[in-house]
């Protein structure tokens, strides 16, 4: 009887320059890992889903990679890192469109790249570019333009959110609770400007100007702009509610520390107090901000029901009226789902930035 080829479970993730594969095999012995003709070959003795056996698999990559994989054995798995030949984002891992049954995305790894790692990587890239340009005798025009552009972008955002934060603070100190009810008419124009400009941040990540992951930036951009432009912007009845003050105040409180931190990073400055604030203040502010957004959605539901705005009727023969409030109720669930995902991501950022007790690997 011919022996059946056993394949282990493999999880993958990527960055612009690297591919990461996690092979679910424990107590691995005699691993044979190589890349020939752009195909990754893996064969090893280990304990997997089918017990202690020899497992193997082959993956033909979507695009060209460097033929020197780097792997690390742990007690529970094999971690493989493969360098892409061209720094770019792949739409899938393999050349064949149909994903192999043993292959799945490593969702934790897709969201784990922290700001601290990105800073170190950016600095290392900058150092290597500087050495290369010096050896070639070329000016650092592109590097300086990129740093100057990012510095100015973060400076403008910092000034915009600082104006909102200071304005709301001063008005509250002078007028007290009365300042809550005209917050929108006082600072909405500046908030519109800052949030429209935030689109650039997501574009920068998508095209590789920055090494930030696209997904967290996109989630925050879409969530905030939905609250600002749909909930507040289209409903005059919502614009004089106190919740607008709390949403705008919490957003600006978070961003003045985030953008000032990024701004100083562009000029290679590290102010430890600011760094600590950037990686700590989100712990109370981020959940409070999500809670304020949820309150604004809840308060808007009866208004949308009453006005019928954005509601529509399905065509014949169904002819069912679909209220916009139905989508708002779904959005409420998405707010708290996003809170969980981003809170977990931000916690890992902070833990990696300030270190953790290292677990002993046998």
UniProtKB/Swiss-Prot annotation:
One of its GO terms (molecular function) is enzyme binding. The chain crosses the membrane at residues 150-170, 186-207, 218-235, 242-256, 280-298, 323-343. The gene is HACD3. InterPro entries: CS_dom, HSP20-like_chaperone, Tyr_Pase-like_PTPLA. Residues 171-185, 236-241, 299-322 are lumenal. One of its GO terms (cellular component) is endoplasmic reticulum. Residues 111-136 form a coiled coil. PANTHER family: VERY-LONG-CHAIN (3R)-3-HYDROXYACYL-COA DEHYDRATASE, VERY-LONG-CHAIN (3R)-3-HYDROXYACYL-COA DEHYDRATASE 3. Residues 1-149, 208-217, 257-279, 344-362 are cytoplasmic. The keyword 4Fe-4S does not apply. The active site is at 286, 293. The lineage of its organism: Eukaryota, Metazoa, Chordata, Craniata, Vertebrata. It is a multi-pass membrane protein. Its EC number is 4.2.1.134. It comes from Homo sapiens (Human). This is Very-long-chain (3R)-3-hydroxyacyl-CoA dehydratase 3. It is found in: Endoplasmic reticulum membrane. Keywords: Acetylation, Coiled coil, Endoplasmic reticulum, Fatty acid biosynthesis, Fatty acid metabolism, Lipid biosynthesis, Lipid metabolism, Lyase, Membrane, Phosphoprotein, Transmembrane, Transmembrane helix. The modification Phosphoserine is found at residues 114, 135. The modification Phosphothreonine is found at residue 7. Highly expressed in testis, kidney, brain, liver and weakly in skeletal muscle, spleen and heart. No expression detected in leukocytes. GO terms for biological process: canonical NF-kappaB signal transduction; fatty acid elongation; JNK cascade; negative regulation of intracellular signal transduction; positive regulation by virus of viral protein levels in host cell; positive regulation of viral genome replication; Rac protein signal transduction; Rho protein signal transduction.
């Amino acid at each position: 009887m011919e022996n059946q080829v056993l394949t282990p479970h493999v999880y993958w993730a990527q960055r612009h320059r690297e591919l990461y594969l996690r092979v679910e095999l424990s107590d691995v012995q005699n691993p044979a890992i190589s890349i020939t003709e752009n195909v990754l070959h893996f064969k090893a003795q280990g304990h997997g889903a089918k017990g202690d056996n020899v497992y193997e698999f082959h993956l033909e990559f979507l695009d060209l990679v460097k033929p020197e994989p780097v792997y690390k054995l742990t007690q529970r798995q094999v971690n493989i890192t493969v360098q892409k030949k061209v720094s770019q984002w792949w739409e899938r891992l393999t050349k064949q469109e149909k994903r192999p049954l043993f292959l799945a995305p490593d969702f934790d790894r897709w969201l784990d790249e922290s700001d601290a790692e990105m800073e170190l990587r950016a600095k290392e890239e900058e150092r290597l570019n500087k050495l290369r340009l010096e050896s070639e005798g070329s000016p650092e025009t592109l590097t300086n333009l990129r740093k100057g552009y990012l510095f100015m972008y973060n400076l403008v955002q910092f000034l915009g959110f600082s104006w909102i934060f200071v304005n709301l603070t001063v008005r509250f100190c002078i007028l007290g609770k009365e300042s809550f009810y005209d917050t929108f008419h006082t600072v909405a124009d500046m908030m519109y400007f800052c949030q429209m400009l935030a689109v650039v941040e997501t574009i920068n990540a998508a095209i590789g100007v920055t090494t930030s992951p696209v997904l967290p930036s996109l989630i925050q951009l879409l969530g905030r702009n939905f609250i600002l432009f749909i909930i507040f912007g289209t409903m005059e009845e919502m614009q004089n509610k106190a919740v607008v003050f709390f949403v705008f105040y919490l957003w600006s409180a978070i961003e003045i520390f985030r953008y000032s931190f990024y701004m100083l990073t562009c000029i290679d400055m590290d102010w430890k107090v600011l760094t600590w604030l950037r990686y700590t203040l989100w712990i109370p502010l981020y959940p409070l901000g999500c809670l304020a957004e949820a309150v604004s959605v809840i308060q808007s539901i009866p208004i949308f029901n009453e006005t019928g705005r954005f509601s529509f009727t399905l065509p014949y023969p169904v002819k069912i009226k679909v209220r916009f409030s139905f989508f708002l109720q779904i959005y409420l669930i998405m707010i708290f789902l996003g809170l969980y995902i981003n809170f977990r991501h931000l916690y890992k950022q902070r833990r990696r930035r300030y270190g953790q007790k290292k677990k002993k690997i046998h």
